[in-house]
């Protein structure tokens, strides 16, 4: 068996198998293959290449592809991911999608979730954020439910036609099974129509309005007057935003929004056939008890040291059951960490440079 890196069949093994199937020799197994297609003798394969040589060869092949400007995306973008991020987030102590059940024991996990929440609030200008949601569309759908929960007796929500199509589809699915009626605001010269919004609000049955900061056409929307009109109708304004642009454009809070949602994928999360991504949500403090998902809060332990806990849990489904604000519990904690590391590495000036490049 010299020369083999594995244990091959012995001649006796081969003979026993051939006898079992009634074949005289191995070549008889290929009797149906035309002789001109049978290979005789060894293959003329080149010597094995080293890893750097293989990489260089593959890169040369890839270099033959034509590189075009990509205008596709619709919420999933091929942004640069610093190589240190996968290294940090793949560490065994971080590698989980869950917020912990024995939360006080997992201070490291709670700390980075708290930092994620803090960064979301800094980007959006909101007062409080949660530990994350499944993705941007889910965050928008949860915001839709939240506006209805806050309005109590109103169950109609208006969606801008400038929202990304898959966001609208998920919101429609949630609305169908929660008894929420949806209305759609038309576009006027690439912007959500304020005139149409005002007309829809006049009916007095609108609980919330969801509009994009950057719409499906790639245009930055001007939402001047939106918050005033929505609040005058005693409804809530939800801004769906791209976090990579928030360092250079108006934040949802500056537009007067009550809720800010979006997808964290632009914050260095690579494309991978649609996921996993991470949704984020920030709200004004008046509405924090209606916000879905888990919330990490900061406190002090018995020795006076800073500590982190899961707070406001009475609103969650493991306590309130069917009366909970949402069924969201487990989340995209690992992807939230990914965004946190990305934002920490880029810093304020780095995010401004990225924002200017994007818009």
Predicted segments with their positions:
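Conserved active-site segment immediately N-terminal to the catalytic lysine
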Residues: 29, 253-270
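Active-site phosphate-binding strand-loop segment of PLP-dependent enzymes
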Residues: 190-244, 266
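Buried hydrophobic positions in well-ordered alpha/beta secondary-structure cores of metabolic enzymes
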Residues: 29, 120, 171-172, 209, ...
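Active-site C-terminal subdomain of aminotransferase-like
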Residues: 267-356
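Short gly/pro/ser/thr-enriched loop/turn and capping motifs at secondary-structure boundaries
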Residues: 164-166, 244-247, 266-271, 289
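N-terminal entrance/gating region of PLP-dependent enzymes' catalytic architecture
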Residues: 31-115, 121, 319
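PLP-dependent aspartate aminotransferase-fold enzymes
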Residues: 79-94, 98-205
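Charged, compositionally biased N-terminal leader segments and the immediate start
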Residues: 1-18
């Amino acid at each position: 068996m010299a020369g083999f890196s594995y244990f091959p069949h012995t001649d006796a093994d081969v003979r026993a198998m051939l006898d079992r199937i009634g074949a005289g020799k191995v070549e008889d197994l290929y009797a149906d293959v035309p002789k001109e297609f049978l290979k005789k003798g060894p293959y003329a394969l080149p010597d094995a290449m080293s890893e750097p040589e293989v990489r260089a060869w593959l890169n040369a092949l890839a270099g033959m592809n034509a590189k075009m400007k990509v205008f596709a995306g619709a919420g999933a973008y091929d942004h640069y991911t610093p190589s240190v991020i996968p290294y940090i987030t793949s560490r065994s102590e971080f590698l989980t999608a869950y917020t912990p059940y024995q939360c006080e024991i997992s201070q490291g996990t709670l700390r980075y979730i708290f930092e994620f929440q803090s960064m979301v609030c800094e980007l959006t200008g909101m007062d409080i954020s949660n530990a994350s949601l499944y993705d941007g569309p889910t965050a928008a759908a949860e915001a839709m439910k939240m506006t209805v929960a806050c309005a109590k007796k109103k169950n109609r929500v208006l969606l801008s036609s400038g929202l990304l199509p898959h966001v609208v589809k998920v919101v429609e699915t949630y609305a169908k099974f929660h008894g929420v009626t949806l209305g759609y605001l038309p576009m006027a010269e690439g912007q959500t129509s304020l005139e149409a919004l005002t007309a829809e609000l006049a009916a007095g049955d609108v609980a919330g309005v969801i509009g994009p900061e950057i719409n499906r056409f790639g245009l930055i929307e001007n939402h001047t007057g939106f918050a005033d009109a929505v609040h005058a109708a005693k409804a809530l304004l939800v801004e769906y935003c791209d976090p990579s642009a928030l360092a250079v454009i108006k934040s949802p809070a500056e537009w007067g929004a009550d809720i800010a949602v979006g997808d964290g994928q632009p914050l260095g999360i690579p494309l991978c056939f649609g996921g996993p991504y991470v949704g984020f949500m920030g709200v004004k403090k008046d509405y924090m008890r209606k916000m879905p998902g888990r919330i990490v809060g900061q406190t002090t332990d018995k020795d006076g040291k800073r500590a982190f806990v899961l707070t406001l849990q009475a609103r969650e489904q493991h306590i309130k059951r069917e009366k909970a604000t949402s069924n969201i519990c487990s989340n995209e904690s690992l992807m939230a960490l990914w965004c946190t590391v990305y934002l920490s590495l880029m810093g304020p000036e780095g995010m401004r440079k990225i924002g200017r490049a994007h818009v």
